[in-house]
């Protein structure tokens, strides 16, 4: 009998997703395959739009007739044929932000091992007399324990009883570790006002205005500045008793006074009462300005009940173990088996090995500085993505296609080796890994490279090089080849140490916050400044949680944040954070609407003879509310299918094919540059660069389109939904309104702006920064990308390590100074 040969590659034929040009490509199975290319060249279209889409669709179609019937409405990828594609999983660039009950320990499932350890192997406390009982195998066997002091029997808590999301939750905070309290300083922000002038804010926003009159009846003077009230009067305002008072109510129109009996609500109770009635996020927002969040006073922020904090292993309880960083917890767990009686050691070793096995990959990915009780929502995008990756590796599945979308985001060069090791583990287990990335160190480790291009948008979508790394390096048409083989070079003139502070200083001194120690920082004005350091070294805390709030407070004449001792930044009026969060909450926000182009286009089309004849004004051309929007999808371009037992499936609207407009919109034309007639749906389907030629004569539109082109966004289509943009694209789009203005009073802060950028795109980004600096702006970037760091004027390197081992300025100076600094981990890679 002939043995059929195992396929050795995924065969893609005729792929036309997005801008792909009918491409044919073979992707080796069981290998680490890198996909490179400039932003918008079609990398994600191939990896996610073809390989993942087909792999996941075929897997889902095998589930059941009902599911298959519903899902076949979801379009197949636009491809002639994909052969031998395994079931596929995608690890996306931006994993969702977890909820309030999620911690680093629960996300990584390390808490499961810890809870099991504290249930099975702890010294438990007798609930009758409070004596400690030696560890015993009875717990694992489901038997009771006998107290050596009082002789009574009891059952030890199970692992479930130690979970803060279950039986072990603190009853006061419900296992969240957080309590909301009224912040009295926020109740009267301006004490120079009188109560009649609205000094007590909650009475004006959360309560009837009548409370001012009631306060007067309580003996408080309401016509003198608040800062002149006696201590007794202030106490009545903040904490006075709820007593009824008789007042005379005069309506605003002054007609007819009405006597009323009214109960006095002091300022603090007004907020507490409003908080108790909150039903949704909108309501919470109204109250939140008067609240401060602090650790729960009963559990101290540990989330655990008193009973769940009783069992001890190696002299500490579960809350203390969870407060350790992962690195410290590993050392502690290693010592657990030896601390127990001999008969307990085999079981303890098994539990500890499961913890250490899961922890090893997290350490390889550079996450050893995170504490297990760190709230999941406070992790950065890169940290969440690496947690997701480590979890996948631990599952040890085989025969799966893993598509990783830029896993090197937020990764310090020192952790790239760990990332490659994790991907190699997946391949070693018999899987295929396709990684879309720009980091040349990641791409250089691939078994096979596919490069898309040559440029972005309509000019891309072709395979310009494919083969081993050596073959791609020798390829004439490759655009990544020079970066795979070349030595790095500086693209901007270096500012000398003597000139660095010629345009002034921004100075700040801080106290301890998180892992950042008290420090003083000096930043040169009008320069490109990079803040660097390994993950967890304190970059984000220093810049986003300290510098920006301090600059904003000083500019507004408000009180500095508690942990900032002083700041000296005379002349700085604006501190702008340009981060990578998606623009717009839903698909109704597009590049054209965000960049203020769509309104101008609507007006232009409303001026045409065809529009006038049909009676269409500018409002009719709105795809959100206008008469010409598609009635099937309501102008969103897509519809959602409800699939029972599965998440809803989004498909392109079958009526408008994603254009968002009804057929009638295609009957209104405007003349383009070459005399061709264009409709608004056709324009919205064009890239920025194509639209420049098509909108000659529309001055405002031209200006805005040229700005987008200069920002390196010429390949984006005007109708592209902004939430779908990559982090780097979103950052640059947010800059569109800032370009060209004088900026010497502004500080721009970018959080990892090179996310999603090819080395060639990084050069475009540097020219954007140059444009801002030339206008006098101070540009501060939190960054791991070595090309950008090399081209900065000034570098502040945090560290030396992450977590407790970081939080200091290791060195500051030019990139050459950092490279020469022996204590700097970043410097070694420069």
Regions found by a protein language model. Name each.
Residues 1-830:
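Conserved phosphate-binding elements of NTP-dependent enzyme cores
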């Amino acid at each position: 009998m002939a043995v059929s040969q195992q396929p050795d590659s995924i065969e893609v034929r005729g792929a036309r997703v997005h801008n792909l040009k009918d491409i044919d490509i073979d992707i080796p199975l069981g290998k680490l395959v890198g996909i490179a290319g400039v932003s918008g060249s079609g990398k994600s279209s191939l990896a996610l739009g073809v390989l993942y889409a087909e792999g996941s669709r075929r897997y889902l179609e095998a589930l059941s007739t009902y599911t298959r019937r519903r899902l076949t409405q979801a379009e197949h990828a636009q491809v002639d044929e994909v052969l031998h594609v395994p079931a596929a999983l995608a690890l996306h660039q931006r994993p969702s932000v977890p909820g309030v009950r999620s911690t680093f320990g629960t996300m990584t499932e390390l808490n499961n091992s810890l809870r099991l350890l504290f249930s099975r192997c702890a010294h438990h406390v007798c609930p009758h007399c409070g004596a400690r009982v030696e560890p015993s195998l009875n717990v694992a066997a489901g038997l009771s324990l006998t107290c050596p002091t009082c002789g009574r029997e009891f059952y030890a808590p199970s692992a479930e009883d130690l979970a803060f999301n279950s039986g072990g939750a603190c009853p006061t905070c419900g296992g969240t570790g957080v309590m909301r309290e009224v912040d009295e300083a926020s109740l009267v922000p301006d004490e120079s006002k009188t109560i009649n002038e609205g000094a007590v804010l909650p009475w004006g926003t959360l309560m009837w205005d009548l409370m001012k009159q009631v306060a007067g009846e309580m003996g408080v003077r309401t016509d003198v500045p608040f800062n002149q009230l006696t201590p007794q009067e202030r106490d009545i305002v903040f904490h006075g008793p709820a007593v009824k008072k008789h007042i005379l109510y005069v309506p605003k129109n002054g007609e007819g006074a009405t006597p009323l009996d009214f109960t006095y609500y002091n300022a603090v109770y007004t907020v507490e009462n409003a908080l108790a009635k909150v039903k949704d996020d909108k309501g919470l927002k109204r109250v939140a300005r008067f609240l401060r969040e602090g650790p729960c006073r009963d559990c101290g922020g540990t989330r655990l009940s008193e009973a769940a904090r009783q069992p001890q292993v190696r002299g500490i309880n579960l809350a203390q173990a969870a407060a350790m960083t992962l690195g410290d917890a590993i050392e502690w767990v290693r010592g657990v088996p030896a601390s127990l009686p001999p008969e307990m050691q085999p079981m303890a070793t098994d539990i500890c090995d499961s913890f250490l096995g899961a922890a090893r990959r997290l350490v390889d990915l550079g996450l050893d500085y995170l504490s297990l009780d760190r709230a999941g929502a406070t992790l950065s995008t890169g940290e969440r993505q690496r947690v997701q990756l480590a979890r996948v590796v631990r599952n040890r599945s085989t025969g799966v296609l893993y598509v990783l979308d830029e896993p090197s985001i937020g990764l310090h060069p020192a952790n790239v080796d760990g990332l490659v090791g994790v991907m190699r583990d997946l391949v070693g287990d018999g899987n295929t890994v396709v990684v879309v990335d720009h980091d040349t160190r990641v791409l250089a480790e691939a078994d096979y490279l596919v490069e898309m291009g040559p440029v972005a948008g309509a000019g891309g979508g072709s395979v310009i090089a494919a083969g081993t790394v050596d073959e791609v390096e020798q390829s004439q048409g490759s655009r990544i080849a020079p970066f795979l083989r070349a030595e790095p070079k500086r693209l901007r003139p270096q500012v000398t140490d003597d000139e660095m502070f010629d345009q002034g200083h921004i100075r700040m001194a801080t106290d301890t916050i998180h892992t950042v120690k008290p420090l003083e920082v000096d930043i040169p004005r009008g320069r490109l400044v990079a803040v660097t350091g390994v993950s967890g070294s304190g970059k984000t805390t220093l810049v986003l949680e300290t510098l920006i709030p301090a600059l904003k407070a000083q500019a507004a004449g408000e009180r500095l944040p508690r942990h900032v001792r002083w700041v000296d930044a005379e002349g700085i009026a604006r501190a702008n954070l340009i981060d990578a969060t998606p623009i717009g909450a839903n698909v109704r926000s597009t590049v054209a609407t965000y960049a203020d182009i769509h309104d101008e286009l609507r007006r232009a089309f409303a001026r045409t003879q065809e529009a006038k004849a049909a009676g269409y004004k500018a409002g009719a051309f709105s795809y959100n509310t206008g008469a010409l929007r598609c009635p099937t999808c309501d102008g969103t371009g897509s519809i959602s299918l409800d699939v029972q037992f599965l998440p809803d499936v989004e498909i392109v609207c079958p009526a408008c094919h994603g254009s968002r407009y009804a057929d009638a919109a295609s009957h209104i034309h405007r003349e383009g540059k070459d005399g061709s007639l264009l409709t608004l749906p056709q324009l919205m389907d064009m890239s920025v660069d194509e639209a420049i030629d098509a909108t000659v004569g529309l001055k405002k539109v031209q200006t805005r389109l040229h700005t987008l082109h200069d920002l390196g966004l010429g390949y984006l289509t005007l109708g592209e939904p902004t939430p779908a943009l990559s982090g780097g694209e979103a950052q640059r789009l947010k800059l569109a309104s800032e370009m060209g203005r004088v900026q010497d009073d502004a500080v721009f802060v970018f959080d990892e702006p090179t996310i999603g950028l090819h080395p060639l795109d990084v050069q475009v980004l540097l020219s954007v920064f140059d444009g801002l600096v030339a206008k006098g702006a101070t540009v501060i970037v939190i960054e791991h990308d070595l090309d950008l760091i090399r081209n900065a004027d000034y570098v502040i390197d945090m560290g030396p390590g992450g977590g407790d081992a970081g939080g200091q300025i290791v060195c500051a100076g030019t990139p050459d100074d950092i490279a020469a600094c022996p204590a700097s981990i970043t410097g070694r890679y420069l």
